[in-house]
Amino acid sequence: MRRGLVLAAALLLSACARPGALPASPVPAGPGITIAATSIPLNAQDPAQDRIGDFRYAGGLALSSPDTSRFHGLSDMALVAGGALTAVTDEGDLLRARLVLDKAGRLVGLTDGRITALTNPEGRPLQGKLEGDSEGMALLANGDMLVSFEQRHRVWLYPAAGPPRPAPLPDATFPDNGGLEALAPDPAAGPDAYVAGGEESGQTWTCRVSTTCVAGPVIAKPPEFGLVAVTRLPKGRTAWLLRAWDPVRGSRVSLVVRDATTEIARMDLARPLAVDNFEALAAVAAKDGTIRFYLLSDDNFQSSQRTLLLAFDWKPKS
């Protein structure tokens, strides 16, 4: 028996003597992450295609991160000067990153990635889908951020400093998974104003942090499409993002630009074009009047879907 114990001890020491394999490079600690970006064509079957009607393709990326499992479910975003991007996820995370453009202004990458948890008014991270299903966001001019949530329907104001607090919510009933997907600042209505839209109904509201919400127009859409994002544009125009999915045709997306009464421009994305579950929309106006639109997709944490970020340029005719 003693001989057996000696042999067992020798085998144990031999097993412990070998160190485990180390990563090829250091693994980051903290919120900073690497964002891998692979350029994709607008149409994989026709890589030369660079337009959809009046919209010119300005680059597209398939995004992922080797550093975290939290880089998924991106459901809305906002952009500010210098290409700083802020996005929220379906599970209560906040992503910050910066766009990378080449010399021609085409989208080629994303850098300076950071992921942190959204918190509740007590300062604790949101827990689980029921509490953290953030779907819409709006960055106000003073740096405050508004976030709309599904499941437990609410809008919270995240001040530039301090804990979040409830913000006005439209007086309406929403399905569990069909709340205020569309949210954006509405500066023409006031410095603390935001426009909100119901996914299934297409009903919109103009809200103010300091007062309440007032019903606006209902966005016309086919019944299979949901209203998922909105952004105000110069000259009183608004861009709306509509999304549909079925197992035969897959994802379909329409970007619609309207003024108060008229549809001005429209871009439809469907197979074989680069399309996925686009839920986020942002716009940047250039000095010559061109509008750069960015569309970001929510992969639903599914390996069969992708996180895509596409850029399109549109120049109004007037």
Identify the residue ranges that each predicted region occupies.
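Sequence/structural signature of beta-propeller domains
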Residues: A15-S318
